[in-house]
Amino acid sequence: MSGLGDDTRIANAFALPSGDILVTDRLVELAKKPEELDAILLHEIGHVVHRHGMRQIIQSSALTIILMLVIGDVGAVEEWTLALPGFLLESNYSQGFETEADEYAFKRMIAMDRDPAYFGHMLGRITGEGREAAEDKAVQDPGSEGWLRYLSSHPGSPARVEQARRYSEIFNAGRLQ
């Protein structure tokens, strides 16, 4: 990925509000089949179709305005605890966007005669790499793991892999008829 430097080894893809989709080299390397990369790209296209980037900007701005109205001056907020509820609410919105993008990808894959299990396979590989980093963090700070799920912008990977499996069953049942 241009601009991130040669040492970027994070497997990721993301959609910008402009509709551009950026993919890291590491994500491409992790894909064992083209269908796996297609699944991730369809997920990102789901973000573009549903305008998640723009909606996130609007929601973030609205939360800032509400915080200003309640507190008076956001610049004067030095206590992170005052900003935490807004951050948690925003993380919840992000998780909803991720679920919506997943659903878009699964439905498009079925329409294209591709098994949604490819998404689950790829997500498992991506989170396997991320899990190693999280385990390192948990060793350094054992109390951090429980809080991470509340601060995450993505739903838990096991639930997403399970959803891909359910859509895969629908896909395979349709092929048998």
Task: Give residue ranges: language-model regions.
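A Zn2+-metalloprotease active-site environment signal
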Residues: M1-L176
